[in-house]
Each structure stands twice: as C-alpha cells, then as structure tokens.
C-alpha cells in the first residue's frame, strides 16, 4: 500500500523545500515540520492496549498506550533530518541507523553502517528518508531490517519517483509507503524531477 498524504500544510512546506533559493536552515525546519505531519498519518493504525488510569477527578478511568515499541531507522545521511520531527510526537521511540552506498560497477546498494536497538523485534519500525528515487536503498534497508523480525515496517518519505515506488512495492508489498508527493520521473542523472535536489546537501549545508 502507498498513500500520498494530501494536506494544505504539507503542500505549503514542500513548496518551500523545493525552491532553489531556500537556505539550509529553512529547509531543515520545513523538513522537520513536514515529517511531523506525515507521521501523524502514518501512525494512525498503530495498535493500542487499554489501561486504567487515575485522573484528578476520578480514581479509575479508561486510557490507552501503544501496544508495541516504535523504532525509527533513518537511512544515512538525509534520513537524519526527519528524526526530530517524529521524536517530537513519539519521544519514547528508539533510533537505529542504516548507511548504504551505491557500488558504481553493479549499481547496487552496499551496506557500510548498521546500528539497531536491542528491542527491534518488539517494535513497529518506521524507515525515514526524504527521497525515494530508484528504490534500491529502501529495498535493501527493508531486506536488512526483516532479518530482525520487527512487528511491522513502514516507510515515510517526502518525494518519490514512480519508478522507485513501483520497485519497492513489487519487492516488499507488505511495507506501507507514505509520501508527500509523487513526482514526475527520474532524469538521466537519477534525480527526481521536479524534486528538491540533493536532500543531504541541503539539510547539512554541504553544497
């Protein structure tokens, strides 16, 4: 399943991120705020446990808590820019990291870094990456995470190319994908068009 999250605030913030004139600090702020809006939608089907609580008015009242732990796994490095947006809503979420690079001979993603919390098998996992281009990195990230048997896996990104979305859904149809915008295509250099450029460079001001 994939869902394009259609909301006026998302459209407004994404437009600011797309602008070539947007400076790094503004880009980061809008990415964080946009991620908050995205994750609100992506987590609406999380399972709950019913609990009893005491309020200032009554001794016993019905309440709820998340059934499973939440683990955020940003794909380095651009995915790091989305973490704080989620943590502001789910401060108890744990964080893992996956680093991948593309082998220039095979064009396939190669893992260069991986660090996961110990409780990932008890967690609903949310993979974070602003861009879904060819889909290779996301597919490989899911391949790696599946070995740890999490409760579920979702992927949240900002912009996606049709080619990448199709590939992810073909290989991992059970992974729900949430996107702010489905863009036109990949250009000859592998960039999403109209896209928003190199998200990592724009987040960290390295270009």
UniProtKB/Swiss-Prot annotation:
Coiled coil located at which positions? none
Pathway given in the UniProt record:
Pyrimidine metabolism; UMP biosynthesis via salvage pathway; UMP from uracil: step 1/1
The free-text note explaining how the cofactor binds reads: Binds 1 Mg(2+) ion per subunit. The magnesium is bound as Mg-PRPP.
By its UniProt entry, which Pfam families does this protein fall under?
UPRTase (PF14681)
In its keyword annotation, does this UniProt entry include Transferase?
A: yes
InterPro entries found in the cross-reference section: PRibTrfase_dom, PRTase-like, Upp_B, UPRTase/APRTase, Ura_phspho_trans
**EC number(s) from the headed UniProt entry:** 2.4.2.9
**Organism domain of life:** Bacteria
Instruction: Identify the cofactor(s).
Output: Mg(2+)
Task: Drop me one GO molecular function for this one.
Answer: GTP binding
Catalytic activity as recorded in UniProt: UMP + diphosphate = 5-phospho-alpha-D-ribose 1-diphosphate + uracil
Q: Which GO terms of type biological process are on file?
A: UMP salvage; uracil salvage
* Ligand binding (uracil): 192, 197-199
Residues reported in the UniProt entry to bind 5-phospho-alpha-D-ribose 1-diphosphate: 77, 102, 129-137, 198
Q: How is its activity regulated?
A: Allosterically activated by GTP.
Question: Could you tell me the keywords of this UniProt record?
Answer: Allosteric enzyme, Glycosyltransferase, GTP-binding, Magnesium, Nucleotide-binding, Transferase
Q: Which PANTHER family match?
A: ADENINE PHOSPHORIBOSYLTRANSFERASE, URACIL PHOSPHORIBOSYLTRANSFERASE, CHLOROPLASTIC
Describe its function. Catalyzes the conversion of uracil and 5-phospho-alpha-D-ribose 1-diphosphate (PRPP) to UMP and diphosphate.
Instruction: Say which family it is in.
Output: Belongs to the UPRTase family.
- Spell out the protein name for this chain: Uracil phosphoribosyltransferase
What is the taxonomic lineage of the source species? Bacteria, Bacillati, Mycoplasmatota, Mycoplasmoidales, Mycoplasmoidaceae
